Amino acid sequence: MKACERLLLKIESQEKFVEEFKRILLELGLTLKEFSEISGIPYSTLYKVIQGKDFRVSTLIKILKTIRSFEKDENIDTIAIIAARPALNKITTRKIGINGKSYLIKEYPANSLEECIVAAVRAEREGVKGIVCAPIVSATIEKIVNVPVAVIIPEKDAFMKALEIIAKKINE
């Protein structure tokens, strides 16, 4: 059953509706803030929904339309990005077009080697077509999963900026 249909079936009870909406957000890998940005529903309105407060039918319609748009995207190939949360926060889009083909981007936060491996296995199980990760974990991940793996190589400017920061700290 599609997420949209599941949510509508829970409309009879506010508690069940809120519980199902939270579950759908988890399945989509979205925070309430991200859902707000995608749907155009103000964050404060969505917060009221999550708190079990009454809301307008127009809000329900927008929620359902947004969830449906993700269901349509299920046929689009997904690429996983495994990185620390601060790096993932710099990603501003959920969909990207490359060579005329659209891809969904799914974030997998990880802060250790073990978390990267777990995220890679989870991503593969969830059906991603490829994984982007840091060079230090790519060799290990390539041995574990059966999807293509690409690495993120920091730009020269990133290294220079880090060197400048550490030099300032040393001289303080």
UniProtKB/Swiss-Prot annotation:
<dbReference type="InterPro" id="IPR001387">
    <property type="entry name" value="Cro/C1-type_HTH"/>
</dbReference>
<feature type="DNA-binding region" description="H-T-H motif">
    <location>
        <begin position="32"/>
        <end position="51"/>
    </location>
</feature>
<dbReference type="InterPro" id="IPR016472">
    <property type="entry name" value="Tscrpt_reg_MJ0621_prd"/>
</dbReference>
<dbReference type="InterPro" id="IPR010982">
    <property type="entry name" value="Lambda_DNA-bd_dom_sf"/>
</dbReference>
<protein>
    <recommendedName>
        <fullName>Uncharacterized HTH-type transcriptional regulator MJ0621</fullName>
    </recommendedName>
</protein>
<feature type="domain" description="HTH cro/C1-type">
    <location>
        <begin position="21"/>
        <end position="75"/>
    </location>
</feature>
<dbReference type="Pfam" id="PF01381">
    <property type="entry name" value="HTH_3"/>
</dbReference>
<keyword id="KW-0804">Transcription</keyword>
<dbReference type="GO" id="GO:0003677">
    <property type="term" value="F:DNA binding"/>
</dbReference>
<keyword id="KW-0238">DNA-binding</keyword>
<keyword id="KW-0805">Transcription regulation</keyword>
